[in-house]
């Protein structure tokens, strides 16, 4: 038996997002960095910073984004902050009807535009490139968060950039 769950966007929430000011985006960017500094992974930080705008509780957002940290479970593939950005875009530009090619195209267009913008800012959207590490799976145990961790990694900046880019994207009027 197959069950289908359709997400019905809340028009009120979308209107709030479309009216979000630069200052409100900056607050969400700051929240994303703060969430990251609390120990959540890069993907969780970006997605959790915007989850409330889509009626998603923080715990649910953290669960949904967990596996994307460290470039997808420390595989060092697509940066987790970028994946978090894409999760937000999936909520903002949903493609829930399999026959609605227009919705899927709109989502993919937003994904490609924001990925290009992130790459222009950071040089890559691949975790291994950003960390200057070999492109191979690592020990699955997350690194300890300490001053050295934050000093040697661009992750905090990646979180801020991704949160800024997605904030700008979801406030555009089309």
Language-model regions, residue ranges each:
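Polybasic, low-complexity association/targeting segments
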Residues: 17-38
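A short glycine/serine-rich beta->alpha loop
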Residues: 30-37, 68-76, 147-153
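Acidic-glycine-rich active-site phosphate/pyrophosphate-binding loop
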Residues: 21-23, 50-67, 133-140
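Phosphate-handling active-site elements
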Residues: 53-63, 91-110, 174
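Conserved phosphate/anionic-ligand binding catalytic regions in large, soluble enzymes, centered on
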Residues: 76-87
